[in-house]
Design a protein with these regions (language model features):
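N-terminal cap/lid segment of alpha/beta-hydrolase-fold proteins
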Residues: 1-45
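Short beta-strand element of the alpha/beta-hydrolase
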Residues: 46-55
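Conserved alpha/beta-hydrolase "nucleophile elbow" surrounding the catalytic nucleophile
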Residues: 54, 150-155
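Short amphipathic alpha-helix adjacent to the substrate-entry channel of hydrolases
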Residues: 61-90
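Alpha/beta-hydrolase active-site loop
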Residues: 97-143
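Short glycine-enriched nucleophile-adjacent loop
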Residues: 128, 155-168
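The feature captures the conserved acid-bearing segment of alpha/beta-hydrolase catalytic domains
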Residues: 172-255
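Alpha/beta-hydrolase-fold serine-hydrolase catalytic core, especially in secreted/extracellular enzymes
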Residues: 258-261, 266-324
Length: 324
């Protein structure tokens, strides 16, 4: 048991954070080498692991508001860079729209979701290599307590290893990628169910969004914004709550009042892709995510209950929490 985490609260940092990147993982046949960033607290042992999957076009260098928060409070956070990252485009100033354009023009776009899943599995498979590559980390990981976290496309990537199944064009279920090594999940702005909920654009270019959550059995927190309007669905913001209502594993849902797709700015400070910049909203996401994962991995810990009380009694009325 990690006393470093269990005895503390999400309201103050416990340690300085050290980060190392890039660590190169073995990835035979991959177009680009698989790079990861690792962030860890300077002190503590038996540290649980978060593997974070970035959103479309992003990279291992993003999401500092979340990553640094978690690492300062006892988690080792590992961030792979996936092949859709704009950092891999032959343009050092490529923005999000250029990443989308590159994806739409790629003959491999239909397989991109699967490449992400393969890279996520590679990352889990090579935890020993990661541990040995970062000075001061060896012997400090709790490899029995691994959580998957993702935002947007990254949430879909994480959900696939939590048990979500992509539905093929003929209606059959794609391969089952559920991984028994994973103990908890956290899905931020995750796409909902497919079928007629998808726009024609989504059906053509993002067929992996035709998915079923019926076999997602691992305990998971879903966080969505009630103002998240997406060109991928004909539904409204409620589409981003499907993972909670349609899976047996998702046991908590947080809906953020006024939240859009970036949930106040979780991908970075003052980044252009954030349309709902709100430091208080980011703070809520930081605290709620940390607390959920701690209580999910260490059931004797009351961090989730304590943090929900803080959130629901906030005079700013930032949102709601629904459990099942």
């Amino acid at each position: 048991m990690n006393n470093f985490i269990v005895k503390e609260s999400p309201f103050r940092p416990l340690s300085e954070v050290i980060s190392l990147s890039p660590i190169i993982l073995e990835s035979p046949g991959r177009e680009h080498e698989l790079q990861v960033r690792v962030s860890a607290p300077l002190i503590g042992t038996s540290l649980p692991i978060i593997i974070f999957s970035h959103g479309f076009g992003s990279s291992m260098d993003a999401y500092a508001p979340l990553v640094n928060y978690w690492a300062a409070r006892g988690f080792v956070v590992i961030q792979p860079t996936y092949l859709d990252s704009r950092t891999l485009i032959q343009n050092p100033k490529a923005d999000h729209s250029e990443a989308i354009r590159a994806y739409l023009e790629s003959p491999l776009k239909a397989k991109m979701w699967r490449f992400r899943v393969e890279d996520l599995k590679r990352t889990i498979d090579q935890l020993n290599l990661i541990e040995n590559s970062m000075p001061g980390l060896k012997g400090r990981l709790d490899k029995d307590n691994i959580a998957l976290v993702g935002h947007s496309f990254g949430a879909q990537t994480s959900a696939t290893l939590l048990g979500t199944r992509v539905i093929n064009f003929d209606g059959s279920l794609n391969e089952d990628f559920a991984d028994s090594r994973i103990k908890a999940g956290l899905l931020l702005s995750v796409g909902g169910c497919g079928g007629e909920a998808l726009t024609p654009f989504a059906k053509e270019h993002f067929p992996h969004l035709n998915q079923s959550y019926e076999k997602m059995n691992i305990k998971t927190l879903v966080i969505a914004g009630d103002k998240d309007l997406s060109p991928l669905t004909v539904q409204g913001p409620e589409w981003f709550t499907d993972a909670f209502y349609n899976s047996p594993g998702a046991n908590q849902l947080v809906v953020l009042s006024g939240g859009e797709h970036m949930l106040g700015g979780i991908s970075g400070h003052l980044v252009t892709e954030t349309t709902d910049e709100n430091p208080d909203r980011v703070l809520a996401v930081q605290r709620l995510t940390w607390a959920y994962l701690v209580s999910a991995l260490y059931p004797e810990n009351s961090a989730w209950e304590t943090t929900c009380s803080w959130f629901l009694n906030d005079p700013n009325q930032q949102g709601t929490v629904i459990g099942k």
